[in-house]
């Protein structure tokens, strides 16, 4: 199994990386670029066949290690 994880800044949190990318795109002549949000994408290979156990394990890893729950949201899917 594989977990695909997306971690993004919370909507209420300032995203300086996203703002920098947004400004750079505007300076490069890309019109109409709105807000840009920069996050993280991870793929984790998982052993075993118990999807519910894998879901619990990834949720715990995201909450305790992979994301900062104060300033980031995460979502994932198990394939």
Question: Each predicted region: which residue ranges?
Answer:
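A short acidic, helix-capping loop that chelates divalent metal ions and anchors anionic groups
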Residues: 45
């Amino acid at each position: 199994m594989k977990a695909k994880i997306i971690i993004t800044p919370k909507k209420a949190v300032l995203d300086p990386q996203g703002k920098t990318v947004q400004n750079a795109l505007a300076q490069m002549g890309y019109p109409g670029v709105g807000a840009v949000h920069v996050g993280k994408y991870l793929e984790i290979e998982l052993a075993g066949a118990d999807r519910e156990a894998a879901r619990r394990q990834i949720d715990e890893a995201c909450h305790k290690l992979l994301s900062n729950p104060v300033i980031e949201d995460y979502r994932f899917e198990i394939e």
